[in-house]
Structures are given as C-alpha cells and as structure tokens.
Amino acid sequence: MEFKVEYKSANARACRIKTTHSEILTPAFMPVGTLAAIKSLDAIDMSEILDAKIILANTYHLYLRPSSKVIKQMGGLHGFSKFDRSFLTDSGGFQAFSLNKISKPDEEGIKFKSHIDGSLHYFTPKSVLDAQYDFNSDIMMILDDLVALPASKERIELSLKRTIKWAKEAIDYHKLKQNQGVGMGQNIFGIIQGGTDFEARRICSQALCEMDFDGLAIGGLSVGEENEVMYDTVEAMMPYVDNNRPRYLMGVGTPEDLVENVARGVDMFDCVMPTRNARNGTLFTSFGKFNIKKAEFITDHSPIDSKCSCYTCKNFSRAYLNHLFKAKELTFFRLASLHNLHYYLNLAKQMREAIIKNEFENFKKEFYRQRTC
C-alpha cells in the first residue's frame, strides 16, 4: 500500500492511499456493505453512480455465511460481488462480542455462537486473518478486545493486555504468511483500544505504533459515550498515533462526527448511518436532516436538497419519495440510500478541498452555519 500526506490545514489531513484495486483520497468515508453488498444497492451503483473507491464488509457475517472458503472459490470479495475497487474487512470481533450473549473472550481469542444456527466458533488473531486472506480484502483488520462503555479500570487494563498481545500475534502471522506468498497485495491495520481513558489510549497507541502495521484504527468509540467525550479522547491520543500511516476511526458516525474528527487528524471513517437512516426515511442535507414521511412533502416538487447533484436529487421530487416511503415501495430504499451515501461521500470531498486550500476551519464554520439556517 502506498500512503502519502499531501496537504494539511491545522490538524486536518488530505492524504492519498493506493491499494491493489483503487486509489483512495482522504478524508474518506467507507459505505458499509456488511454482507459484501450495500443494502438495496449493487456494485454498479457503488462504482458508476456513487464512485465509491472503497467499501467495508464484515468478517463475522461472511465467515458464517456463505463462508470464507466459498468466497475464495468465487474469486474473493471482488470476484464474488463484482465490486472491483477496494474492500476493507473488519475482524468480526465486535459482532462476535455484541451479537452473542454467551460470547467469551479469553487470552487467546473469542468464543461465540453463530446467530444463524447456534453453532460454536472461536475467533483468534490468526483465524480472522485466514478468513480475510480468503476474502482477498485490500485492508484487513486485526482481532481486538472491545471494551463496553462505561468500563472499570481493571477491564480496560485487561483489554489493553489482550489487544496488544493479539496485535503482535497478528502482525507476526501476517509477515509469516507473506513470506509464504499469501496476502501479498493485502494490508493490515492495527486497532487501538483503551475506552475513554486517555492514559490507556496513549499506552495502546504507542505499543501498536511500534509494530509494522500499514495503518492504525481507533476502535471502541461511538458506543454510547457523549460526542464531546469521543472528540476529547481522539484529540488526546492523536499525538501518539503515527503521522505516516492512515488513521481510521471505526464506526463513526454523523456528519458532525466526521467534521470534528477530521479536524483532529482522522483520515478514514465507516458507518451504517447513511443507509440505515435512509431506510427509515431520514435524509441528510446541507442544512441538516429531515424525515420524508411528513405530510408537508406530499405535494413538494423540490428535490431532497437543492444543492445536491446526486442521482436521486437530479431526477425525483420529495413528493415522489414521500409516496414511495408511505407505500413501502422497495424503490425508495435505493433512491434514499443513493442520496444519503452521495451526501457522505461528497462531504468527504468538500473537506478534502478545504484542506487543500488550507481553509478547513472556515469550512467547518460554514458547515455549522448552514445547519442553523
């Protein structure tokens, strides 16, 4: 993977990442395709209409169904889904933890039951990489020990111990596999844990920065803490996160979260929010968000956002979308998802342009001003 910080505006960064399958300009938002598909959209929508350079898929779900072996047989995620740009796959540890009441992390990994058929499974630092080698994802995430917030000091210390141990096992295993000719075009990111404890974040950041990861992710935030707590935690740990590698904040977030964390030096984001909200009728715009189901839109000729150039806004009215949503017409999911994802991807482009011009602070002020109009 090639990586370069091209421009800065205060702490905000505009970077260039080159993988085997695409070139990614940051700040970058990654649409979430849990099952190797963005809900209601296909590979053509993602590449030709939205021009997404990278999407995220989920190791836990794909490992269970259809299985990593089936995906490998079908040509990896790219051959299977026909999305020919970059894939980032998470380790599945979060899902193993959050979807299973009986999940049991220990010193070697995480035991869990399949939410599909109840079968027992065990994720280890090596096994989650083996699945991702089968996927041939461009960026692989390591297994980490997630801390549910709020957490005791003892639980955070245990999480750090496991996360650092598993990170070392993962990077050593990846080097071994590459020496054997496996995963040659694949990259591996470490995940920094520590809850909202600044000292724990510093310790974990420094430990992982000493390892030869291609990029560094911030995990364990946006899990119920107040927004300001998340922002303060990111800001406190950034001095200890390597400047010369991509920085990825996992599972974040709202448009405001993206702007605030880009201001603090984050490069990459993913979140289900744009597509999940789209399916519930909530649409993002330059002036905030609104729900299309309201009666005021029944005869509204205007597009979702007059400043938006997406496929949906160029072709359809609020009135039509209001009708589709109330009629439970499946077409609504596609049109709303196209709009919301375009909004997020375009927000990332606008932030990049502002950073290149060294005007990010002005962009941020205007971003919030429009939301109060």
From Swiss-Prot:
Which superkingdom heads the taxonomic lineage of this protein's source?
Bacteria
Residue ranges, annotated region (RNA binding): 251-257, 275-279
> Which keywords has UniProt assigned to this entry?
Glycosyltransferase, Metal-binding, Queuosine biosynthesis, Transferase, tRNA processing, Zinc
A Pfam family per the record: TGT
Functional pathway: tRNA modification; tRNA-queuosine biosynthesis
One Gene Ontology MF term: metal ion binding
Record's protein name:
Queuine tRNA-ribosyltransferase
Q: How is the cofactor bound?
A: Binds 1 zinc ion per subunit.
Q: What is its EC number?
A: 2.4.2.29
Give the species. Campylobacter lari (strain RM2100 / D67 / ATCC BAA-1060)
For this record, an example GO cellular component is:
cytosol
